[in-house]
Regions:
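Acidic helix N-cap motif at the loop->helix transition within catalytic regions
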Residues: 1
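Generic structural signal for residues in well-ordered beta-strands
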Residues: 18-20, 130-132, 263
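Short loop/turn segments at beta->alpha junctions
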Residues: 27, 137-138, 157, 267
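An extracytoplasmic/periplasmic, membrane-proximal ligand-sensing/linker region
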Residues: 170-172, 176-177, 194, 202-204, ...
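Early extracytoplasmic/lumenal segment of secretory-pathway proteins
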Residues: 17-33
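Hinge/capping helix and adjacent helix->loop/strand transition within the periplasmic-binding protein
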Residues: 7-15, 34-45, 54-148, 152, ...
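Ligand-binding clamshell of periplasmic/extracellular solute-binding protein-like
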Residues: 4, 26-29, 43-56, 75-78, ...
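A ligand-binding cleft/hinge motif common to bilobed small-molecule-binding domains
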Residues: 51-63, 116, 120-125, 153-202
Length: 296
């Protein structure tokens, strides 16, 4: 957020000042509720909301927002989730994982987080022998558990893997076996130097594909920026233009590279269309998705 805001202001008419306000709580639910229901509609509020909101809206229900009605201005990067396994498992690809006799033990923070959802879905839909242990306070704790042998796998954002455990990737201590999102990244290789498969492409039928698309929505929406519903269209368009200009700004890209930030931009129209498609997932399939996770 800080990096984008620092450069975004240069492209907004009048070059206004930005004040960052953090609003933690409920896994992003508090901030989403504020932006959707309380924040002024005059264009003076810009939000970077949780990428989990589309999935939460369907899987949790009873939320105080509708992601399809937000005014998106763009996405700075995807949150492509990559499933990694520790080198001692001997697993170097998804095919190896399918043949593994010992379960791959994944560390996770909570049952509503992607580091729990992704490996759970891989076990249920792909038939992999996995066990997911939830309760770790965060990524650092799971990484420590990997080093200590408590767990043998973790699903996490590719950007997080690179910034926090890039040395493990280079040394081969962790091996990528799958990626989750709506688009495949050819840069993510398995232990054999091959592109890791996109989970969405492994769906056996249309229903499975729709369910996997729902679970991949957080990766697709990624690090997105939006404005409340009801903001005048002219102001939204101005912000969309400013955001697009920022994403190609040489100073911004150099700053992002210095901070080891992956930039994979998408325009406001793409985000709006994606959010609407996700929210339109048929209720019977949402029910099946909840059942896969063991949610009542």
């Amino acid at each position: 957020s800080r990096t984008v805001m620092k450069h975004l202001v240069k492209h907004i008419p009048g070059k206004p000042n930005f004040i960052l306000q953090f609003m933690p709580g409920g896994g992003g639910q508090k901030a989403a509720g504020y932006v959707y229901n309380v924040a002024p509609r005059n264009g003076a509020r810009l939000a970077k909301l949780s990428n989990m909101l589309p999935a939460f809206q369907l899987l949790r229900g009873n939320v105080k927002y509708d992601v399809s009605k937000l005014n998106y201005i763009g996405r700075a990067a995807s949150m492509q989730y990559v499933t990694m396994v520790w080198h001692t498992t001997g697993v170097k690809s998804l095919k190896d994982a399918a043949k593994a006799k010992k379960p791959i033990i994944f560390g996770a923070s909570g049952v509503s987080q992607s580091n729990y959802i992704v490996p759970t879905v891989m076990g249920k839909l792909l038939g992999l022998n996995v066990k997911v242990v939830a309760g770790y306070p965060g990524t650092a704790a799971i990484n420590k558990a990997l080093e200590q042998g408590e767990v043998t796998g973790r699903a996490g954002a590719w950007s997080s893997w690179i910034s926090k455990a890039g040395h493990w990737i280079k040394s081969g201590q962790v091996v990528a076996i799958a990626q989750s999102g709506l688009e495949k990244s050819g840069d993510i290789k398995n232990g054999y130097g091959q592109a890791t498969p996109l989970l969405l492409d492994l769906a056996k039928n249309d229903d499975e594909r729709a369910i996997l698309k729902l679970f991949a929505s957080d990766a697709a929406v990624g690090r997105n920026f939006s404005m409340p519903p009801g903001v005048p269209k002219a102001r939204v368009k101005a912000m969309c233009r400013a955001f697009d200009a920022t994403m190609t700004d040489k100073a911004f890209l150099a700053d992002a590279k210095k901070r080891k930030l992956i930039i994979e931009p998408k325009p406001c129209e793409w985000l709006s269309k994606t959010a609407a498609e996700i929210v339109a997932t048929p209720k019977p399939l949402v029910k099946k998705a909840r059942a896969l996770l063991g949610w009542k």
